[in-house]
């Protein structure tokens, strides 16, 4: 059995969980999420906790046990607290703007790069116009959106210019050695 999968998931106040076979629906103060879990795993609700258990002892059931427990736990945390990723834009003249549901990046290309935020995800500016905060209730969508924004101009190893996650360490390389 999975060490992670064995742990019961506590349900906080103001969060309701509806189980319908393999479908799990979670409602909370920030919104609601639905997900269909893979086969070979059963989800049961006992008092104020949710328990995920494998159907049998097969390899696929054991593989999916911890996965399903983490997916449900992420849904509960998302509707109660939400998720956010912070990105830093480093480079001379590099900046970002948020207009409604659209993020515009000026990162050294001839034209600005415009990105439409998916449903349920919001982009906001940090203290400076070189910080972008991407937030939402679905951890997977927030992470994918942040990765797509970072992929527009990933940090390069020589000068460190580009878009990076806040606190991300970039391995730097030495430049070409000059001629003697």
UniProtKB/Swiss-Prot annotation:
Query: InterPro entries given for it?
Result: Ribosomal_uL6-like, Ribosomal_uL6-like_a/b-dom_sf, Ribosomal_uL6_a/b-dom, Ribosomal_uL6_bac-type, Ribosomal_uL6_CS
- Give this protein's Gene Ontology molecular function annotations: rRNA binding; structural constituent of ribosome
SUPFAM superfamilies, alphabetized: Ribosomal protein L6
- A GO BP term, please? cytoplasmic translation
Q: Is Ribonucleoprotein tagged as a keyword? A: yes
Its keywords, alphabetically, are: Ribonucleoprotein, Ribosomal protein, RNA-binding, rRNA-binding
Q: Which domain of life is it from?
A: Bacteria
Q: Does the keyword Cell division apply?
A: no
- Tell me one Pfam family matched here: Ribosomal_L6
Signal peptide residues are none
Any one annotated GO CC term: cytosolic large ribosomal subunit
Family indicated by similarity: Belongs to the universal ribosomal protein uL6 family.
The annotated subunit structure for this chain is:
Part of the 50S ribosomal subunit.
Q: What does this protein do?
A: This protein binds to the 23S rRNA, and is important in its secondary structure. It is located near the subunit interface in the base of the L7/L12 stalk, and near the tRNA binding site of the peptidyltransferase center.
Q: NCBIfam families recorded for this chain?
A: L6_bact (TIGR03654)
Q: Which PANTHER family match?
A: 60S/50S RIBOSOMAL PROTEIN L6/L9, LARGE RIBOSOMAL SUBUNIT PROTEIN UL6M
Task: Name the chain's protein.
Answer: Large ribosomal subunit protein uL6
């Amino acid at each position: 059995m999975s060490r992670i999968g064995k742990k019961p998931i506590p349900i906080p106040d103001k969060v309701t969980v509806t189980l319908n076979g393999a479908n799990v629906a979670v409602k909370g103060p920030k919104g609601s999420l639905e997900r269909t879990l893979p086969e070979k795993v059963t989800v049961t609700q006992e008092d104020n906790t949710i328990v995920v258990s494998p159907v049998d002892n097969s390899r696929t059931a054991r593989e999916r046990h911890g996965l399903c427990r983490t997916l449900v736990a992420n849904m509960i945390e998302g509707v109660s607290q939400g998720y956010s990723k912070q990105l830093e834009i480093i480079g001379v003249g590099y900046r970002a703007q948020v207009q409604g549901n659209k993020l515009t990046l000026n990162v050294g290309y001839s034209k600005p790069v415009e990105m439409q935020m998916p449903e349920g995800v919001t982009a906001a500016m940090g203290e400076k116009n070189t910080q972008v905060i991407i937030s939402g209730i679905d951890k997977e969508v927030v992470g994918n959106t942040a990765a797509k924004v970072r992929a527009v101009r990933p940090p390069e190893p020589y000068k460190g210019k580009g878009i990076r996650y806040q606190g991300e360490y970039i391995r730097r390389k030495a430049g070409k050695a000059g001629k003697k």
